[in-house]
Amino acid sequence: LASRGLCPESGGWLSDQVITRSACRRVGAISGPTLAAEVMARRPCALVIASLFDEVGDITQKALHSSVCRVYTSRDLRGVETAGAMVEMLACVIGMADALQLGLSVRGVIVSRGLAEATRLGLALDAEAHTFSGLAGVGDLVACGAHPKHPRYQDGRSMVKGGRSVRVA
C-alpha cells in the first residue's frame, strides 16, 4: 500500500487496514521529505520507516538506502502515521492561506502552530513528540506539504478560488 493519511472509509490507521484486509501482520509506514520528481532525478533525500517490528525497518532500509537516499528507522508507527495525516491537512490550510494572499507570516503561523497541535494529538495517541519535529513531521511539511504541486495544497487553493468543497482524507 502506498498512501498517506487515514483510511477514507473508516478514519482508521492505514496500517490497521493492511493488517485487517491482507495476510500481512508486520507492517510499517514510510514518510519524509521526498518529492517523487526529485527522487527520480536522484537528488538527495531522506525518509523514515516506522514499524513495531525491527526487521521491517531493517529490510526497508536495506532496500531503499543509497548514496542519495538516507533511510532512518523508528518504532513510532502511530507518530509517523499521525504526522502524515496532519501534513495533508496542513498542506490544505497552507494552500488556502496562499490563495487568500495572507503572506509568509501566516504560513509560519500555520506551520508552527499546526505542528504544535499535531504533536499534542500524537502524544494523546501514544506517539513520540520528536517524530513531529523530524522527517515525518516538519521535514515532510516543509518539502512536500507547502509545495504548490502537492495535491492537498492545490485542494486548499481550489476551496478558496473556486468555492468548491474538497474531501481531504
Segments (PLM) and residue ranges:
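Residues at the C-termini of beta-strands that transition into short coil/loop
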Residues: S31-P33, R75, H147
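Short beta-strand segments
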Residues: L1-A2, G28-S31, V48-S51, V93, ...
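Internal alpha-helical scaffold of NAD(P)-dependent oxidoreductase catalytic cores
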Residues: Q17, R21-R25, P44-T131
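Rossmann-like NAD(P)(H) cofactor-binding subdomain of soluble oxidoreductases
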Residues: L1-P44, T60-K62
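Short glycine-biased active-site loop of nucleotidyltransferases that positions the nucleotide triphosphate
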Residues: E38-M40, A83, H147
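NAD(P)-dependent Rossmann-like dehydrogenase/reductase catalytic/cofactor-binding core
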Residues: V87, A91-D98, L123-A169
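A generic alpha-helix surface/boundary motif
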Residues: G12-W13, L115-A116, Y153
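Short, small-residue-enriched loops and turns at beta-alpha junctions
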Residues: L6-P8, G79-E81, A143
